[in-house]
Amino acid sequence: MYFTKVHGLGNDFILVNAGTGQGFTDDCSTLAKEVCDRKFGIGADGLVLLYDSGVADVRMKIVNSDGSEAEMCGNAIRCVAKYLYDHGIIKKDEIKVETLAGIIVPQIIQQEGSVKAVRVDMGEPRVERAEIPMIGPPGQVIGEELAVNGKVYLVTAVSMGNPHCIIFVPDLEDISLTQVGPQIEVHPAFPKKTNVEFVQVLGPNEVRMVVWERGAGPTMACGTGACAVAVAGVLNGFTERMVTVHLPGGSLMIEWAENGRIYMTGPATEVFSGEYTVYNPSRR
């Protein structure tokens, strides 16, 4: 199996161009667990598979390191756009990518023939409780109390095609992400589980965040999470519609435009390529 290792701000993926998918494994969950293992596999936060699409330029499938499938990933889609453009597979400034969250359109920002950054139209956020989804009465979830193991957090829920639970705090240093993150991820209020973001507001156009990703745990960056944080900042009156989001792996520029759509701009990096031997023949 030929692969390319890529990352967006340290959120890393194993990218495989599966084409028609003919002859490729149906057991992507087991494959992802194997190749994403950082001690016995290649090591990554997730496996990204590219297939031919009948409705877009390409179809992207994302499988987390725990084998669960994700609807969408902002860092992964920037990496996909860079890979397709730099390798001459799709030489267009705008690439239509089919995902479980709908068709997403990354825009190439190039310099001297290669991709410098990628601006992605992430679509419109969903803020109604049922769209997250989150258990409870109809309406938006903005600064709502959520009890977690005897402690109460004020949460804001946003969907970017995948669920996000955002919590604003005075200081990120006071948060034990590895303890609280997994507790909220599987909280019964979220029937499909949730990504969890803790956010410190630095100013009306600047925030810091850390993320516990559903199915992956703590990661260096989360593109959809940064978009959800930008929306939550506006809904709570903490930030303006253009905000720089600082993550452990670097920064993303997020704009919630007046047309209601979210635009994310950030880098993508190709690390290396190789061939991986999948030892179980049923997974080849």
Curated annotation (Swiss-Prot):
Q: List the disulfide bonds.
A: none
What metabolic or biological pathway is this protein involved in? Amino-acid biosynthesis; L-lysine biosynthesis via DAP pathway; DL-2,6-diaminopimelate from LL-2,6-diaminopimelate: step 1/1
Q: Active site: which residues?
A: C73 (proton donor), C222 (proton acceptor)
**A GO molecular function held by the record:** diaminopimelate epimerase activity
Q: Where in the cell is it found?
A: Cytoplasm
The yes or no answer to whether the keyword Isomerase is present is: yes
Which residues are substrate-binding?
N11, N64, G74, N75, N162, N195, E213, R214, G223, T224
- Its Enzyme Commission number(s) read 5.1.1.7
Query: Which top-level group of life is the source organism from?
Result: Bacteria
Q: Which PROSITE patterns match?
A: DAP_EPIMERASE
List the residues marked with site Could be important to modulate the pK values of the two catalytic cysteine residues.
H164, E213
Q: Which family does it belong to?
A: Belongs to the diaminopimelate epimerase family.
| HAMAP family listed in its UniProt record | DAP_epimerase (MF_00197)
* Function according to Swiss-Prot or TrEMBL: Catalyzes the stereoinversion of LL-2,6-diaminopimelate (L,L-DAP) to meso-diaminopimelate (meso-DAP), a precursor of L-lysine and an essential component of the bacterial peptidoglycan.
Instruction: Please identify the protein, giving its name as recorded.
Output: Diaminopimelate epimerase
Gene assigned in the entry: dapF
